[in-house]
């Protein structure tokens, strides 16, 4: 069965369409109007092994906040829909991602109890034209809407680009493990409750 989903969300602030195939090859077409954010989402798709299409039109004349946060919301919703009740997946995943002087780790639990632990510090307020505080907004929106407990921590690192990108890659690699089909579950949700 194909694990794909498409979600469309339109508000007065943003119009967003996300399509994802969890069992893809890492191909992506991303258009958010924010160059660095596009780069991060392309990296997320590539390292997660997800085929991903994102089309976002936001109120960038105000700032980037709505565009970044709302795209995280819709991406999380699309992945959750594609997971179909978390049936048959491994549920847990983790990754350590080095990027030159930076090392970031992510642990994820597809528990349907969303939570974000964020231990990431940036030495500069911007990378490219993007405010670095928006990376937490993305990860929070994503975790809340995919239904995942996400712990993301940069252990060390100086370069702002590397800190941001290693975070997206760590999330992608951890999620890639968590969404893998586990034949031992027999197609059921991996929980003693029988449902997530």
Curated annotation (Swiss-Prot):
Pathway: Amino-acid biosynthesis; L-histidine biosynthesis; L-histidine from 5-phospho-alpha-D-ribose 1-diphosphate: step 6/9
Molecular function as annotated in GO: imidazoleglycerol-phosphate dehydratase activity
Gene3D superfamilies: Imidazole glycerol phosphate dehydratase, domain 1
Top-level EC class as recorded in UniProt: lyase
Keyword Signal: no
The UniProt record lists the keyword Glycoprotein: no
Domain of life: Bacteria
Annotated compartments: Cytoplasm
Any one biological process term the GO annotation gives: L-histidine biosynthetic process
Classification via CDD domains: IGPD (cd07914)
E.C. number(s) listed in UniProt: 4.2.1.19
Chief localization: cytoplasm
Record keywords, A-Z: Amino-acid biosynthesis, Cytoplasm, Histidine biosynthesis, Lyase
GO cellular component annotations of the record: cytoplasm
Catalyzed reaction equations: D-erythro-1-(imidazol-4-yl)glycerol 3-phosphate = 3-(imidazol-4-yl)-2-oxopropyl phosphate + H2O
Family: Belongs to the imidazoleglycerol-phosphate dehydratase family.
NCBIfam families membership: PRK00951.1-5 (NF002109), PRK00951.2-1 (NF002111), PRK00951.2-4 (NF002114)
Identification of the protein by name: Imidazoleglycerol-phosphate dehydratase
Lineage, highest ranks first: Bacteria, Pseudomonadati, Pseudomonadota, Alphaproteobacteria, Caulobacterales
């Amino acid at each position: 069965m194909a694990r794909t989903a498409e979600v469309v969300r339109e508000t007065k602030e943003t119009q967003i369409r996300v399509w994802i195939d969890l069992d893809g090859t890492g191909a992506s077409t991303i258009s958010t109007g924010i160059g660095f954010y596009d780069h991060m989402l392309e990296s997320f798709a590539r390292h997660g092994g997800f085929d991903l299409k994102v089309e976002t039109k936001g109120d960038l004349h105000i700032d980037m906040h709505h565009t970044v946060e709302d795209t995280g919301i819709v991406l999380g919703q699309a992945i959750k829909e594609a997971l179909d009740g978390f049936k048959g997946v491994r549920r847990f995943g983790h990754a350590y991602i080095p990027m030159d002087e930076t090392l970031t780790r992510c642990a994820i639990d597809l528990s349907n109890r969303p939570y974000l632990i964020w231990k990431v510090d940036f030495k500069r307020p911007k990378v490219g034209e993007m405010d670095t505080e928006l990376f937490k907004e993305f990860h929070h929106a994503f975790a809340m809407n995919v239904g995942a407990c996400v712990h993301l921590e940069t252990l060390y690192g100086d370069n702002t680009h590397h800190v941001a990108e290693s975070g997206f890659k760590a999330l992608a690699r951890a999620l890639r493990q968590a969404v893998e089909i586990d034949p031992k579950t027999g197609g059921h949700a991996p929980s003693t409750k029988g449902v997530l």
